[in-house]
Amino acid sequence: MVSPLLANLYLHYAFDLWAARWRRREATGDMIIVRYADDIVVGFEKEAEARRFWDAMRARLREFSLSLHPDKTRLIEFGRFAAVTRRQRGLGKPETFSFLGFTFICGKSWQGHFQLKRKTRPDRMRAKLQELKDELRWRMHQPIPEQGRWLKQVVTGFFAYHAVPANGAALSAFRYHVTCLWRRSLRRRSQKDASTWQRVGKLADDWLPKPKILHPWPHQRFAVKYPRWEPYAGVPHVRIWCSEASCHSSGCKSRQHRSPVDAVVISSDVPIALEAWM
């Protein structure tokens, strides 16, 4: 096993520095590189460059005894113009991709303009709720205030990461399911327990935070953080983001790392994307 820290350092040299050099020397259109641990997203303005980078990346990784997982590597149409170009060719909606717990979707605003939306991945929410359910069984006989304080921490932590614009439905669903699990746990404490919906609803109002969007739209955050690097942050042609993603760029000669790497290559004007594992 290679520790996450060592794996991250390895990929910094094996991928990040090399990718940044490729962008400087080869890219003629916009190109954005995002990596968080072993998750990678690369955005392109031009489809041809996305395909050339994909080939070059495979060759680069082979030098370090790494390879892209064939089933988890995709080149997809995605971005501002993806829906229009696919509709002109008689195809369906643009494909989605997952990154750091979110599903990224080509959506529209209330005004009908393009809007990149992030939704909590259903499997991640189910896993979190199952974890909470198991913990509630252990805490079943704790005093209600103690349970309430713990559940408040759980819900607050979930919201702190997932409370992004356009994800309000997932926040409400998570809080609702937490309330249901709490009620079920209270009713199991005793056959005579009368934990009605009205009573548990009041407990939820007392202890569980209400759904609230906590993060700004990515273009607002990026425009402040990278005003020079990204002059068109307000009206992007290519935009890949994630609340916790950190951008790196890489090249190393060590051959110790063997863990899989996720990647997505996105092109917006000619919308294409690639998902990968090593």
Give the role of each language-model region.
Residues 1-278:
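Non-catalytic terminal/accessory segments
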